[in-house]
Amino acid sequence: TGQTTCYNSTGGTIACAGTGQDGQYQAGIDPVVAPTCCGTTNAYNTPAWTGVRFTDNGDGTVTDNLTALIWLKNANCYGPPNWATALSNANTLANGSCGLSDGSTAGQWRLPNVNELHSLIDLTQSNPALPAGHPFTGVRSSFYWTSTPVADSTSYAWFVFLYNGVVGDDDETMTYYVWPVRGGQ
């Protein structure tokens, strides 16, 4: 998650040792990316995040240097459709739409899974809960669909609330925003 600080229940900074928070483990660093972006290692032998989190590729995409995922720069290209339409919109995204000039074709983009979308969240921020200085445009402090269906339901899927980073689930007929991604899985 890129978190290196730990917090108590009132939001105050605390020592990370023994908390079990992300700041203690500093997990989520891709070892392939680590040599070019990261500095020292922690007690768990994972690199501590010290690099530039996002790269604006200048073609309508943004690379997350922490996860190596490529995101659509425009986080509000489609407005808020239902879940089935959100899946379709992401899958049919291609060069020439939504500000893209990257040469991508339909089928290369997809709706992110719940872990991928939540990896963008910075819990020290709100409205939206994204890292300060992020390069994205059109971000709504609202609900965004993920591709992850709820395991014990045939009509519910997971979302991330960009206002504060909360993850929840809702009926697939609800209309939430779409933020396509490519790479990873």
Located regions from the model:
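Glycine-aromatic-enriched surface loops/turns that form tight recognition elements
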Residues: 1-110, 114-185
